[in-house]
């Protein structure tokens, strides 16, 4: 039967003459029938020259093709009649515009299709499409583009899309870019937000929350607002966002939202359900479960021990199965396994063991690759993404249908699964552990690109449409192949038209108002805009999303607790515009910290911007400094994008010196560390708390959980004397890129820096020096005033105009490694009591109050019901993750922050014995001090000691003191050689009265080797106006102690490396006690001895130098009267946090400080066992009755340890229900100083720093400083072995991998004798014989780690002797994420590897923290 009507026309359009499935024949091409036409309303584009036809042109009567009159003869396309009008919609071969929930076509056609709703031409269109624009709802549009379109056509379609959106919605639409950033998106659309993530992946959970919150904020601000979701490639991203927002909007949905929810569900089922990956479905389920409360959130970190994957022997014919794993945390690579090889038929399951266990928290992605037989390619076996907040057991299993890539791979068995084994501790799991078959071998030494590539390191690092005239490429593959993709820019790019002028403010929401289910010809009435959610709905949303990192105007749960209360910033309200576009995310801020749980938002001050989640921001100094690039290091390397993410984010104020940031300065960033912003500048606008906080400020201390930081009067940094400038920051997981080389080297004012090449005839040919002299308004106690660095041995100059001697910015080093049995050096005569090494087998434990069992203290009657104190639980011993390669990129306290008020030079707490031969000739330089009145310099003879320098900055000419040189001491049997250092030129100033104001009667106890004598120091004679014979007593309250002893002289261009008294096999020792440097008040002067001051020892005399922990330089000259406990108030608690919070203190150090104190004395430190928690060490009167027998000092048993856990509500002592949450550590300390609650006794708040309470000691002879060693540098000759690329790996594992590669390669590398020099600028290698190279320099900011081989392997020399192997890890030039380990072996027995490594780690790397 012959068809008629619409069906006949449909079949004709499809090229079929009847209803049978006969093959269609091509129609005969017919000539065009052109006629002249004037184009007025919408001029088309010429079909030949692609230029818009302005005015008159020609148009074909049949096919409607348009062209210029002059181009008419050049038309080559055939003329074919268009299909009927009712069938034209959804059949265009180029782009498809579809309306779900709408019945009108985009061109306002009144004609409607009579086809049934179920009929679809989608299968015909899947072959070729360039744009798929779908109205998901009336206010949510989805714009999808193919993955790899022609770039020029793609730009044209983007312009058409922008034109359509502008014509329909004007500036009322907000475009969410879910793919890589593009310049033209920002250029063509008024408001764009970038929330991109890699294709076929699930977005981070907090990013999912952020997108939904931003959509909600935009749509609720104005009923006419529209959201456009832009996606390029797989449409699964659209499904993830639409599904997530569907669940999000149901929280506060009304009756008018039911239809929108239905259409969103219909879109997901019909359009994107088949394109969703298993991980994307999993994250949608996570999001829905967290919103509904069906998923209980687990906020504790997990340690991954094993990954069990199935064996796939037939994965690649001829090659077998060679898998390896890559583990990412928040899209940053944290682990790469070795390549596993299976010989013959092996077991059904392969066990990949992670040693040590890998700490994971947050979004985790595990990818398994198969290394190809040729070794140059790799194939993705499976990929799985999950979030640790949803894991509540020790095992996590994923079957095949939940594994990305594997779920559609027939080579992956249907019954196979992937299993992860976790625990809450890094210790090995006891009991039966999975083991591999003996036929399984592992290759850890591979350096092939297929294994090393990190496919995600360059995502969103640049704009996708960036064209700079050169080849654009990605350094790593994005599809699993080992090769980068190179794209040539188009030869001719048409100019992008400028956006249309802003339209009138009032327009209709949309012309698409009727819903397709009605099938009516008349549009229905417009649905009113959604009202903004009520306060109750917002609170409910906050409660549900509290743990996800984003709340409805509140701060997330991931933010760590501050030592001092935050001056919280209020939230943004939903208004007609958000003021953060383009490029920034709206509506995400922090709550005031006054209330527990989830609170309502407060008002917001002006002048802030939101730092979007999942973005990478170029770091700026909040106090007005600027990033600078050191000499000899490219600026691009200085601005390495440090991947950071925080589960909480808030409003950031613009520093006054910077102004508003430029748009588009954000890229993708993966999590790792919490952001810290300094808000102490008095010039910043005040941030007011909510009214409830202001009322609580008037309450007594005991009633406050959140305490406010009071400011003192003053100017500049002196007004903040003694106050922490940063809140403590908690790293969430171990990362391989850890030291400030990742973009944290800041110069105060690069505008004032100048490069000075070496003058003719001067030494220092190894590099040129540079000078920085910032203005006073950029002053910071931790920054140099005028510091001259040089590769040679230049002496820093002093800038009297700046009023401050240069300070080195240092912090306690945290170098630790794997101690090996019997690895102590013969020189290790003693160990500093300040930093005892951890015994290998010792377990650490905390006392956690619980309801039943464990250690019990007799409690007062009114506290008896609170529950006894619980037994201690065993924790892990300290591992290498706590060292420089562990968690310490950002400072944990105000005292060791980068560029903070720290003057410590990171001298080791164990004795550092210096052997420094120096030639007699001078090698110093003079630098311009830029003083209003040039201060004359004083030349000291080698026999004179350098007098102290006044820091008053008055420019007064100094009086030249006279005196004898230092007295020699008796020889020490263990002292290595130390020839004299070179003389120095110093501008000298003397304070009135003959000696400096800051001298303190208290002094630290030097830690020396047994048998080393201490002689009284005979300083220079007093000046004429002081009593005769009274020396200027230089008590270095902030400098290391030095003890001298004579040795036969030696001669060498630079000092040798100081020999450490005690170091492990990898050359690293325990961190010193953290220093406390208090800024002087407006009327005070700092201590008399700056870091750069030192006496110049006499020629021919060697000196034995010993460093001790650094102490405060703000010691009062007269002791203050004791403060009564009852007089404590808010300000007192805030000001004393520097006395009891010691972040880098070890447990043994805390015991040593507290064991001689009265009961109630306490210290709080960062927990090394539980990341993000604190440890409370408390001295008690008697041990608990159930305490275990103690073999050591019984006094040490009186120091008990408690764990302070952190959470969304604040901090609390773990294990006791009666313990409330406190807004800060200060609040917790204040309350427990009044009432012990669950503690054995009340806390006694100290009135002074316990590190300063040391007995007086004789002043050692010949004061010298670590700064002298840095200026002169230390050098020796070593054997250079090789350099091994370690991808993103650093720390001891990088050195171990490089050592394994060097020792296993055949033939072994030929060593070369090189001159190894360490100075303030970095490490310089000079091959005197020029066999391998001439000279190589590694700037200090590129060096991330240094140690000896953790496995204590040795290099075998040709004569049969062996030498210890050591190395340092530095950034690979031109690659911000890859590292290279440079390997060496000892050459001179007097310069052991441990001494070199200790010098690098403790002095060189520590001075820039």
UniProtKB/Swiss-Prot annotation:
Domain C2 tensin-type: 299-425
Gene: TNS2
Positions where Phosphoserine occurs in the chain: 118, 120, 455, 466, 481, 820, 825, 830, 832, 835, 845, 931, 941, 972, 991, 1003, 1247
Biased composition (Basic and acidic residues): 9-20
Boundaries of every Phosphatase tensin-type domain copy: 122-294
Full protein name: Tensin-2
Domain annotation PTB: ranges: 1275-1408
Assembly: Interacts with AXL. Interacts with SYK; leading to its phosphorylation. Interacts with SQSTM1 (via PB1 domain); the interaction leads to sequestration of TNS2 in cytoplasmic aggregates with SQSTM1 and promotes TNS2 ubiquitination and proteasomal degradation.
Residue ranges, annotated region (Disordered): 1-35, 462-536, 562-582, 812-1098, 1111-1130
Catalytic function, reaction form: O-phospho-L-tyrosyl-[protein] + H2O = L-tyrosyl-[protein] + phosphate
Modified residues (Omega-N-methylarginine): 555
Places the protein is found: Cell junction, Focal adhesion; Cell membrane; Cytoplasm
Protein family (similarity comment): Belongs to the PTEN phosphatase protein family.
Residue ranges occupied by any SH2 domain in the UniProt entry: 1140-1247
Keywords: Cell junction, Cell membrane, Cytoplasm, Hydrolase, Lipid-binding, Membrane, Metal-binding, Methylation, Phosphoprotein, Protein phosphatase, SH2 domain, Ubl conjugation, Zinc, Zinc-finger
PANTHER family assigned to the protein according to its UniProt record, in alphabetical order: TENSIN (PTHR45734), TENSIN-2 (PTHR45734:SF1)
One term under GO cellular component: focal adhesion
